Amino acid sequence: MLNFFLITIQFLSGAVMYSHIIAKIKGIDLRKIRDGNPGSSNLWRAAGWKYGFPALMLDYFKGTFPIAFFVWNESFHVNRYVIAFAALSGILGHAFSPFLKFKGGKAIATTFGAWSVLTKWEGPMVLGTVFTIFSILHRLRGKNKTTPEEDAFRVMIGFAALLIYTMWKVFNGMPELAILYFGNFLIVFYKHRLELRRYLKGV
């Protein structure tokens, strides 16, 4: 019963679309911004960092709660595979929010949150390093902003690096990370599929 409760609550936590709520309060329709994604990146572009940054942090932290409580409080004795499925359910909730007719965000910030809890920030450091290198190279080419297609490519490169890290952890006593990784990859790939298709056509 506890396992089902944890997975369900984590899904509902991920499904709360803070960026959409903040945008509505500001009178902004995120569906008309850039790629129409109802996430923090588009809110940032539409309303600036004062609104985008808090939304980004909320998207991040909903990937950590409530699983962090169960991970750090060993008295609950929750199976680590259940924790992995719960972390994945939070990402799924953001990507396919029932509060937005199952049309959610790209789930990158929520992914960072989930991996922070299960890997003590190691997973997000892998993704963050790849994203930073990509941004530096992009600026060296004289570009200040990335397109949705370039963002999608960056995410896929980041997940390729995360796969290497995941396999290393799997073979060193954390096989449950394979569940989180492959489920997470499928969700993120699906959410970026159209941008990736356009990117590959333009290469």
UniProtKB/Swiss-Prot annotation:
This is Glycerol-3-phosphate acyltransferase 1. It catalyses: an acyl phosphate + sn-glycerol 3-phosphate = a 1-acyl-sn-glycero-3-phosphate + phosphate. The lineage of its organism: Bacteria, Thermotogati, Thermotogota, Thermotogae, Thermotogales. GO terms for molecular function: acyl-phosphate glycerol-3-phosphate acyltransferase activity. SMART domains: G3P_acyltransf. The gene is plsY1. It is found in: Cell inner membrane. Its EC number is 2.3.1.275. Keywords: Cell inner membrane, Cell membrane, Lipid biosynthesis, Lipid metabolism, Membrane, Phospholipid biosynthesis, Phospholipid metabolism, Transferase, Transmembrane, Transmembrane helix. GO terms for biological process: phospholipid biosynthetic process.
